[in-house]
């Protein structure tokens, strides 16, 4: 069955199609796996609990990475970590990860965010050396998602307007679903555009992903010149990869990261999890995405199951430095949910031949 919903945001008309994903045959980059590093759950740094790393971005000037924690202030205030990853030799192991700093994100009033006032998820460094970070919002508490800017010291530096369709409303339900809002953040190399997306469909756009159907998420493209959304795209996720056990247990699949290759081409990451599924229950897939009209057309790039290693809840992705033989690096990171049976995982890939 095929259903169409029309939504207008400002002057932008978007047709949302709850159907099979739009699959393309575009040219995708070659990826070669070069190793992993594990940071155990419970690791402490400078008085904070290291974990929940849901997004990562690379600072080429400093050869450092920034990774945001999705702690809502339950353990410590909202924050991001500065890390060094020794990857230029084309390998990654546990000893190659060094935590260097932790920075508290500050609310517009200049103070740390109050507990349970945001759900920090996406993070990206822009050309003007500001950070953009996203919050999924907390629909159960009536808190809207947001997209904000911060200086590298964590201080508030502005906010991008969020289209009304994403805002939380109760009757009838509309806007982002709980834990299915703005999980991603990516900026084009030329600094013109910022991308983020809902992880699944907005309430008014269709169902969340299940073991039988995908979900029509919305990708937003912001012009960094105007600070406003100038285009929206429909991205239909895959269905949940594995049935949960029992079949009434929790399961999810969603669009968790976007990494621009150019103005119209992205790498998208989907993460599926099912309670009771084999192994860790996680399935992570990468797609090359071409933006055509208002549709995101997916081409399979990599199913991380082929790596043959246990996968945690991988949600973050960034390009890093050139490796020793000239290939560009790609780094992925997992959000361990601060759970004792999970782990923070960094994965290294070489891009190109």
Question: What do these predicted ranges mean?
Answer:
Residues 5, 23-353:
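Sequence/structural signature of beta-propeller domains
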Residues 1-24:
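Secretory targeting and sorting signals
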């Amino acid at each position: 069955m095929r259903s169409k919903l029309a939504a207008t945001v400002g002057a932008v008309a978007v047709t949302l199609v709850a159907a099979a994903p739009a699959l393309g045959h575009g040219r995708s980059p070659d990826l070669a796996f070069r190793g992993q590093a594990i940071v155990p759950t419970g690791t402490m740094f400078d008085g904070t609990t290291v974990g929940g790393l849901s997004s990562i971005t690379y600072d080429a000037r400093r050869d450092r990475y920034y990774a945001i924690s999705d702690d809502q202030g339950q353990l410590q205030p909202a924050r991001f970590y500065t890390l060094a990853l020794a990857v230029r030799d084309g390998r990654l192991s546990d000893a190659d990860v060094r935590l260097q700093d932790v920075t508290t994100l500050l609310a517009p009033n200049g103070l740390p965010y109050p507990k349970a006032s945001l759900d920090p998820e996406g993070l990206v460094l822009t050309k003007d050396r500001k950070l953009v970070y996203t919050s999924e919002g907390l629909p159960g508490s009536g808190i809207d998602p947001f997209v904000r800017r911060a200086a590298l010291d964590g201080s508030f530096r502005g906010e991008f307007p969020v289209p009304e369709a994403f805002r939380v409303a109760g009757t009838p339900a509309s806007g982002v679903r709980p834990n299915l809002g703005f999980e991603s953040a990516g900026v084009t190399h030329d600094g013109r555009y910022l991308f983020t997306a809902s992880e699944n469909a907005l309430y008014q756009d269709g169902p969340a992903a299940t073991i039988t159907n995908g979900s029509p998420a919305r990708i937003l493209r912001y012009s960094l010149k105007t600070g406003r959304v100038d285009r929206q795209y429909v991205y239909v996720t895959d269905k949940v990869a594995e049935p949960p056990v029992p079949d009434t247990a929790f399961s999810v699949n969603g669009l968790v990261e976007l990494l621009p290759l150019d103005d119209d081409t992205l790498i998208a990451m989907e993460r599926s999890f099912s309670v009771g599924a084999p192994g860790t229950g996680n399935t992570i897939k990468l797609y090359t995405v071409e933006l055509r009209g208002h549709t995101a057309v997916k081409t399979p790039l990599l199913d991380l199951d082929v790596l043959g290693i246990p996968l945690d809840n991988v949600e973050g992705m960034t390009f890093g430095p050139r490796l020793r033989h000239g290939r560009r690096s790609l780094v992925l990171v997992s959000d361990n949910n601060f759970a004792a049976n999970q782990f923070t995982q960094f994965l290294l890939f070489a891009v190109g031949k």
